[in-house]
């Protein structure tokens, strides 16, 4: 975990700039008076990809925001962007956002007009531009109850369809043939996570997610428990995937490919 950008350091730092060997006609200088720093410059690239795909804006339409909009800070797309960009940067755990909420570069990537959080309405939140772990946890665990702690219910079926359509629209409309690859990959766990099961094939505890690709394009990623075989739940997934591909590529021949774990009559029928 990196040190929060606002954290003070007891180390005596050099204040004078350091000069390095010139790079052609350019001078290379190290200056320690740069102000707010971040080690996550890749967040800006993630934002550009998000803008091109319209990911967070589209996903935001799968949620219902019951919060009082007059007092809302941050907005729903900003919450989604913070969580998704954090995952893309390698911060999988929500408690990572205890420090990430202080990162001005991540705040700028999440479209915050005040990346330092100096103008926030609540004085207790000033200097903290982004949300903490508890807010993001409520977003992830939101349900269909409009209670004090659950103000952002989501529609799982709508999210599923949204992500599928985003993948399918990358396929060429006039494709002659579309090869759909099925894969089940063991995801081992190292604790007592909810839903973990022992899988004899992997000789360990974990999950058995289902992945569906067309070439390098991901169409489906479904978390499943490991107490079933690779083919479990594939038929309902394929029905949705094939229908979406058929709507996009009307003249294409669709082939479904998988290893022996998917050699089941219900899939081949």
Question: Positions of the model-derived regions?
Answer:
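Dynamic "connector" segments at or just before major functional cores
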Residues: 1-229, 235-250
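Acidic/histidine-rich, metal-coordinating catalytic segments
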Residues: 183, 252-262
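Gly/Pro-rich turn-and-neighbor structural signature
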Residues: 262, 266-269
């Amino acid at each position: 975990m990196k040190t929060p950008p606002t954290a003070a350091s007891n180390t005596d730092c050099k204040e004078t700039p350091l000069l390095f060997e010139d790079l052609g006609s350019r001078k290379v200088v190290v200056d320690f008076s740069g102000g707010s720093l971040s080690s996550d410059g890749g967040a800006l690239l993630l934002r550009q990809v998000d803008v091109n795909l319209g990911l967070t804006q589209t996903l935001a339409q799968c949620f219902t925001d019951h919060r009082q909009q007059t007092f809302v800070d941050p907005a729903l797309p900003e919450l989604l962007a913070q969580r998704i960009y954090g995952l893309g940067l390698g911060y999988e755990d929500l408690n990572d956002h205890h420090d990430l909420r202080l990162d001005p570069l991540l705040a700028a990537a999440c479209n915050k007009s005040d990346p330092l959080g100096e103008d926030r309405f609540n004085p207790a939140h000033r200097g903290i531009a982004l949300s903490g772990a508890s807010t993001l946890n409520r977003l992830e665990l939101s349900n269909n109850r409009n209670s004090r702690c659950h103000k952002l219910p989501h529609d799982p079926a709508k999210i599923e369809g949204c992500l599928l359509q985003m993948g399918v629209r990358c396929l060429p409309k006039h494709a002659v043939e579309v090869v759909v690859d099925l894969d089940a990959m063991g995801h081992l766990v190292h604790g007592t996570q909810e839903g973990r099961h022992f899988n004899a094939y992997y000789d360990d505890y974990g999950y058995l997610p289902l992945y569906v690709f067309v070439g390098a394009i991901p169409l489906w990623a479904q978390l499943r428990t490991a107490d079933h075989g690779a083919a479990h739940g594939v038929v309902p997934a394929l029905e949705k995937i094939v229908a979406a591909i058929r709507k996009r590529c009307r003249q294409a021949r669709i082939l479904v490919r998988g290893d022996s774990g998917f050699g089941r009559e219900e899939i081949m029928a």
